[in-house]
Curated annotation (Swiss-Prot):
SUPFAM superfamilies: Ribosomal protein L16p/L10e
Pfam family, one: Ribosomal_L16
Organism annotation: Dichelobacter nodosus (strain VCS1703A)
GO biological process, one term: translation
The protein's role, per its UniProt record: Binds 23S rRNA and is also seen to make contacts with the A and possibly P site tRNAs.
Transmembrane residue ranges: none
Subunit structure: Part of the 50S ribosomal subunit.
Name of the protein: Large ribosomal subunit protein uL16
Region (Disordered): 1-24
Annotated Gene3D superfamilies: Ribosomal protein L10e/L16 (3.90.1170.10)
Length: 137
């Protein structure tokens, strides 16, 4: 599971996820990419489940890049505990995703194989996505 090795602070405030992706919005490493079209939070488990779906479909061919990293801690209080007494414990980590963020990239496979692998991966994610090509300058 993805999570930071160490952080400056253990817990974070929730914040707001507004605007469009200013960086990480182009296919830079591979030939094809899976780009988010809606905003949301991807948990480390969802990122891993989608990665497994991609790798299972492409088998040994091709290389896959994960372009998002869950670096935001989400806290939760235990069940049946009254409010107060401080913030809850960190339960899981999320990556905040904005429209335009490239989530995964792939190279070394045919377009049909990449499309199908990304379709399987998109079913595991809570955001809507689209298939992207690398822009040749």
């Amino acid at each position: 599971m993805l999570q930071p090795k160490r952080t400056k602070f253990r817990k974070q405030q929730k914040g707001r996820n507004r605007g469009l992706a200013q960086s990480g919005n182009t296919v830079s490493f591979g030939d094809y990419g899976l780009k988010a079209t809606t905003r949301g939070r991807l948990t480390a488990r969802q990122i891993e489940a989608a990665r497994r779906a991609i790798n299972r479909h492409v088998k040994r061919g091709g290389k896959v890049w994960i372009r998002v990293f869950p670096d935001v801690p989400v806290t939760n209080k235990p069940l049946e505990v009254r409010q107060g007494k401080g913030k809850g414990n960190v339960e899981y980590w999320v990556a905040k995703v904005q429209p335009g963020t490239v989530l995964y990239e792939m190279e070394g496979v045919t377009e049909e194989l990449a499309r199908e692998a990304f379709r399987l991966a998109a079913a595991k994610l809570p955001v809507q996505t689209t298939f992207e090509y690398r822009k040749v300058m």
